Structures are given as C-alpha cells and as structure tokens.
C-alpha cells in the first residue's frame, strides 16, 4: 500500500461508548495512613532494631545506596534473618519494607514472612515492574522514580501492575540527572508523580528524604511545601526527623474542627449542602474532611 492508502489505526475509545468507571479512592476515610518512613542501612542490624522501636510508621531496610559493595551479601543475609523472625512477621509489628539492590535481593527475600513490601530503585519503565512482580508474586511494590525518563513514564509505571501500591521520587539522583540546584526546581516532578499516582488510583506519594538531619526548621518548611503539592508523609534518615514530619503532615486543630463540622453537617443533610458561613459542600469536600479526621485519629 502507498502511504495515503494505509488504514488509520482504530480509535482508542468509541465516543458513543460509555466511559469506564473512575477508580475507587484508595484512601479509606477511616484509616490513618502511614506518615513516617524511616530508612536504615541493611548491614547494621543494631540500627535496624532501634528503628523498629523508633515510632516510625514504616521501617525501610536499605540494601542499595546505604550499603557498601563489599557489604551487600552480609546486608542481605542480615535482612533475611530479620524478615524470618516471627516477631517481625507479627500482625501488630511495624511494617518492614526493603529497598533492594538487585534481583538477588528479590529472590532471597520475597517469600519471608516479615517482608511487607519491596521498594524498587531507579525504575524507568513499566517492564521492570512486571519482571519483579513475576519473580515475587504477591509482594507489594513501590517503584522509585529517579531520572528524567522515569518522570516521563510516571503514569505507566504507577499503573503497570496491581502489585504496585505506591510510587515515590528519588530526589538526589533526579536532581543530578536534571542538573537542578534549587529545591523549587523539583516541584514539576513532584507534581507529576502526585498526578500519576492519583490517576492510577494509588495513595498520594511520600516525600523524598530531607538530607540535613540537623536542620529541623528546613525540614518543616520542606514538608509544608510537599503537603501543598499533594504529597502525604515523608521518608526520613534519622529518628529525630520523625516528630517534625508527623506534625507537618497531621492536620491542625483548626483543620480538625472544620472537618468535624463538615462531617456532622453531612450526617444531617444528605447531598450538597451549604454551611452556616455560606460555603458550598459536596461529596468530595465531605470525603476530604473524613480523611482529615482519619489523619487526626478522630475517625
């Protein structure tokens, strides 16, 4: 066939066909999501033990950047011992995620009872997610987007497989890849992963680590910026950061009071309603208010 005789590809969606249903909101109204995610080096079992008692909502054992090459095998063995411990696997135990270095880590740890999830560094394509999901069936996955290419593929990665439970940025590598010096230069990428996560019916992304463990004021300011962009919670690299992160992401007393007023009003009058101060409230506003109360532990 000549070029103009070549048939056009089929339209992706018949305009007359009904639109597919919107995905369900992955944030239950009555469940408080984790806010603090503490990274610890996998070759330091004593540090991991302290992290499990630090009050962090999730502990992430790092087998990648935090472990020197000649310590990788030891770190994997120590992590396997931890994840095989019945105490780690108990229903009320702190969830333990593992940021893997490679496929050897995945194969060695995937079936251990104390593993809550894998965090997959430097993911750039959905095919990588499919591969890990195939060799570690049933394990929740959290791809980390750390390059310009990953940001371009954010939605395809987020929606790659039902094993994906969330996505997040790896900002140190991303900053280097993009040549960004000022923190605000990453806001586009942050917003991109927030939109990709929500479009894929995933929870809001967790903010990347704040590297200066002494600058708690700077951490607070950075968390406020992340919250404004739609992120929820933050990874930490030191226990002293946990309290600041939690306070930054928990609703204020005023926000809780406002949410209680909205939820109470919605219980009396179904559907769209107007508050005494004249503001219009619909189902989306009520759902947001319920999430606020869940965060505050008031649901």
What is the predicted function of each stretch?
Residues 2-299:
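Expand to "…catalyze enediolate/carbanion chemistry for C-C bond making/breaking, isomerization
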């Amino acid at each position: 066939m000549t070029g103009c005789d070549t048939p056009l590809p089929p339209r992706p969606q018949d305009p007359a066909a009904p639109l597919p249903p919107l995905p369900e909101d992955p944030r239950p109204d009555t469940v408080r999501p984790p806010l603090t995610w503490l990274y610890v080096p996998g070759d330091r079992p004593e540090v991991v033990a302290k992290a499990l008692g630090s009050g962090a909502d999730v502990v992430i054992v790092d087998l990648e950047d935090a472990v020197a090459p000649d310590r990788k095998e030891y770190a994997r063995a120590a992590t396997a011992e931890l994840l095989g411990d019945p105490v780690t696997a108990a229903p009320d135990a702190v969830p333990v995620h593992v940021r893997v270095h490679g496929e050897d880590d995945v194969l060695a740890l995937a079936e251990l009872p104390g593993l809550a999830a894998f965090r997959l560094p430097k993911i750039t394509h959905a095919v990588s997610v499919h591969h890990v999901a195939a060799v570690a069936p049933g394990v929740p996955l959290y791809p980390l987007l750390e390059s310009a290419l990953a940001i371009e593929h954010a939605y395809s990665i987020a929606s790659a497989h039902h094993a994906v439970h969330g996505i997040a940025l790896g900002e140190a590598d991303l900053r280097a890849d993009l040549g960004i010096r000022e923190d605000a230069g990453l806001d586009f990428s942050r917003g991109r992963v927030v939109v990709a996560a929500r479009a894929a019916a995933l929870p809001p992304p967790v903010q990347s680590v704040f590297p200066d463990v002494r600058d708690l004021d700077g951490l607070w300011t950075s968390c406020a910026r992340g919250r404004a962009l739609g992120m929820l919670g933050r990874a930490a690299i030191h226990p002293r950061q946990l309290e600041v992160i939690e306070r930054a992401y928990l609703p204020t007393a005023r926000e809780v009071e406002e949410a209680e007023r909205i939820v109470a009003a919605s219980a009396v009058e179904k559907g769209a309603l107007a508050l005494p101060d004249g503001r219009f409230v619909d189902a989306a506003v009520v759902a947001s208010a319920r999430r606020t109360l869940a965060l505050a532990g008031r649901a």
